[in-house]
Regions:
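Membrane-interface helix/helix-cap signal primarily in integral membrane proteins
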Residues: 2-182, 531-536, 545, 591-608, ...
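Non-globular, low-confidence helical/coil segments that flank catalytic cores
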Residues: 55, 67-86, 97, 103-110, ...
Length: 762
């Protein structure tokens, strides 16, 4: 276990910063720049061999990432720099399904981020080769955008240079949702095209194996350094060098052996790659071709590549009768099925859904990808001679990307284009791959038995039938795995309410027995909370449709995430109904939200005091009930906090209260209207502000536990000390997203369980 956990432990500097979590600490550091990346608003400078001073303490940090402003000192790779700034640790995933920033950077050996206030170059010595490659990449990117425009130029830059800083976000999402997102990342497909293309070209010019191999390898190594040396590109580079080495030494190249050596080399360098999406997808794709390709080839009655056996004469004769198009289609389908079925586990684990048409879409897009890449490379070099010559060639690549857009849009219009299964647990993944391994074992056992039989015996037809069964079993196993994963998120025995960590804002997801509900969704300190925190959480929990989204009031920290969800329904989470307070309490923000909802096909409703939404769990038995307690019609309340929609959730003996931002005036009216009960759990109003959770309100509701949603080190000082004291005096246990991340309450109507994503059971 220590091998796989190597590098995951906090560095000494990170431990020092964690002594005051959430705070930015003033530091001074000296180190050598080894990499520079241009981002949207800042420049990321990667520094190695650093000495970091924090107060009176000094730490040696092998690698750091520093954000500097574009207008600050011009730094080059190899420079030794002295930087003053504020240091912080990377965020962990604070909701299920969210991006774990810390894990991502720790895999690269980086534990701390510094925001630079001042930068001083103390040595102008440069790494000439790396600096040249960095400048080449930057100028190449600028040329592509200048020739093709921001949209297609950014796409070509991502494909050729691995630079996604200008990649259109909607295009990236469109490709990912349709299962062709791998085309936008530098992968084995790209590296193989470039590496083998250069190698073959050099061989055709008359160079020998050794000369062509050395030259091709040197060019591909330089290219890998230029694009940032990601996991998939390193895998492709290692396998290319092994391939060329085999040619140079006159040996046969074995794909499986090459794959194993590449995996061993990368895992030895960084054991945490074993948990990296890029590593698993890159190696898994090749492993699928090696391991499952022969199984599906037998199922479709074609050749059995990778078995090391020759086809018999009758099979060769049969293949000659097939048209070239049919053979191409069968080969593409076999490859696509092999890759997708072996990668099903990582796809569900990291992306939570399966694009159902991706098998067929990849048959169309992969064969023409070399056209786009070839046009991009050739057009770039021709542009150096004359833009008038290079531009038409580059536009061939632009036309390919335009075609991809149209294919993805067409696929998105087809019914049932994606199946949201949620994030599978470890048990399901282990079971799936054990069954896959057993089916492959059965196939290879049967294949070897068949090869020992006399091919002229009548039993050969029986063998062909038997050899088709493992492939059918693999497809059935993949379907069952996907369906079982989704069904595993259904609450057969109870309901669940989760207070998401959206920073300084509010968002609560309720999963009933049959339907899904959301109460608010927004943040004032987390940008793109809808697409970065709320939607990934929902998809990871197998929620592709929200039946009711309740909006308590129109403040940005309660609705801006919902606005994102409404706009992105086509590729994200569908919203059936938007529920708002009575019309008289609407402000301009709520009216705009209603317009946005109706524009995107969502029905807008109002909920008055006394209205309720109830589920039935069979035989007329009432299940979850959400009842509106306020505001009542005709009350003298201003639109906003004090007129927040207040909801009472009941399920069996369980009671939970959601209060929006009501504060003292709204709480006073609730106490007077006589609808309040005693509650097991209170979702504290207004992030625990001073004016909320008054003594009278707590005396009436008598909550056993209070859940507070507030941002870490927020500027408002929420939750306020006075509020916490009142809650404690009322005998209430207090839990906050600041410490625990997502807070999840599960109940069967009697038993209640509470846990946080960053903490154990509470």
């Amino acid at each position: 276990m220590s091998f796989f956990g190597a590098g995951e432990e906090p560095s000494a500097l990170e431990m020092a910063l964690l002594e005051d979590p959430g705070a930015d600490v003033e530091v001074a550091l000296e180190g050598t720049v080894y990499r520079i990346e241009e981002k949207a608003k800042v420049t990321a400078v990667y520094v190695k061999d650093s000495t970091v001073s924090v107060s009176s303490r000094k730490f040696n940090e092998s690698k750091l990432m520093v954000y500097i402003r574009p207008d600050q000192t011009k730094i080059k790779i190899g420079n030794k720099v002295k930087i003053y700034g504020e240091a912080s640790v990377f965020d962990r995933a604070r909701n299920p399904g969210n991006f774990d920033q810390r894990t991502y950077y720790v895999r690269q050996g980086i534990h701390v981020l510094v925001w630079a206030e001042s930068v001083k170059i103390i040595s102008r010595e440069t790494d000439a080769a790396r600096q040249f490659l960095a400048e080449l990449r930057s100028e190449w990117r600028g040329m592509l955008i200048g020739q093709l425009g921001e949209y297609y130029g950014g796409t070509m830059s991502a494909v050729l240079l691995g630079d996604k800083s200008s990649l259109d976000g909607e295009m990236k999402k469109l490709y990912q949702k349709n299962g062709i997102g791998h085309l936008l990342a530098i992968s084995g497909l790209h590296m193989s095209f470039i590496g083998m293309g250069i190698y073959s070209l050099l061989r055709r010019t008359g160079l020998g194996f050794i000369s062509a191999g050395v030259a091709g390898g040197a060019i591909l190594i330089a290219y890998t350094v230029m694009i940032g040396a990601g996991v998939s590109s390193l895998r492709a580079l290692i396998m290319f060098l092994i391939r060329v080495g085999a040619d140079m030494t006159g040996r046969d190249y074995d794909l499986a052996t090459s794959l194993a050596l590449a995996a061993a080399a990368l895992v030895w360098q960084q054991p945490l790659y074993m948990t990296d999406a890029g590593f698993l997808l890159s190696f898994g794709a090749i492993l699928g071709l090696v391991l499952l390709g022969p199984v599906f080839a037998a199922m479709f009655g074609t050749a059995c590549p990778g078995t090391g056996r020759k086809k018999n004469k009758s099979r060769r004769a049969g293949n000659k009768k097939c048209g070239a198009a049919a053979r191409w289609l069968a080969g593409g389908l076999i490859s696509s099925l092999s890759v997708n079925i072996l990668l099903l586990g990582p796809i569900l684990y990291f992306y939570f859904e399966v694009p159902l048409y991706s098998v067929f879409l990849n048959l169309l897009v992969i064969p023409i990808m070399p056209v786009a890449m070839g046009a991009g490379i050739a057009g770039s070099f021709l542009t150096l001679i004359s833009p008038a010559i290079g531009s038409p060639v580059l536009k061939i690549g632009k036309a390919v990307f335009w075609l991809y857009d149209q294919l993805c849009s067409a696929a998105g219009m087809l019914p049932a284009g994606r199946y949201v299964a949620g994030k599978p647990c470890a048990g399901w993944l282990i079971t799936y791959y054990v069954i896959l391994g057993c089916l492959c074992g059965v196939f290879y056992f049967l294949y070897r038995r068949k090869e020992k039989d006399d091919p002229e015996l009548p039993s050969k037809d029986r063998w062909n039938i038997l050899l088709r069964l493992p492939g059918c079993g693999l497809m059935l196993c993949a379907v069952l795995m996907t369906v079982a994963c989704r069904r595993g998120y259904r609450n057969a025995e109870g309901i669940q309410a989760a207070v998401l960590d959206v920073g300084q804002g509010d968002c609560i997801h309720i999963r009933g027995r049959e339907e899904n509900y959301l109460i608010d969704g927004g943040s004032s300190d987390v940008s793109s909370a809808g697409s970065c925190r709320i939607e990934p959480y929902l998809l990871a929990n197998a929620v592709d449709t929200l039946d009711y989204v309740f909006v308590t009031h129109g403040d940005e920290d309660h609705i801006n995430g919902i606005q994102e969800l409404l706009k992105g329904q086509e590729l994200g989470v569908r919203i059936r109904n938007l529920v708002l307070p009575p019309q008289e309490y609407h402000d301009e923000k709520l009216e705009e939200l209603i317009y946005l909802a109706q524009k995107n096909g969502t029905r807008a409703l109002v909920m008055n005091a006394g209205d309720e939404i109830a589920e039935e769990i069979g035989h007329g038995t009432e299940g979850l009930v959400l009842k509106c307690l306020g505001p009542e019609d005709g009350q003298e309340l201003k639109p906003g906090n004090e007129a927040s929609l207040v909801l009472d959730l009941s399920y069996g003996e369980f009671r939970m209260l959601f209060t929006g931002d009501v504060e003292s005036r709204g709480e006073e009216l609730l106490c007077k209207n006589g609808r309040l009960e005693q509650y097991d759990v209170l979702k504290a109003a207004h992030h625990g502000s001073r004016g909320s959770s008054t003594e009278e309100f707590l005396r009436v509701t008598q909550p056993a536990a209070a859940l507070i949603s507030a941002g870490v080190d927020n500027r408002y000082g929420h939750p306020h000390e006075e509020t916490l004291e009142r809650l404690e005096a009322a005998g209430c246990r207090i839990y906050s997203t600041q410490q625990s991340g997502t807070l999840t309450v599960w109940t069967d109507g009697e038993i209640i369980r509470l846990k946080g994503i960053l903490t154990s059971d509470l």
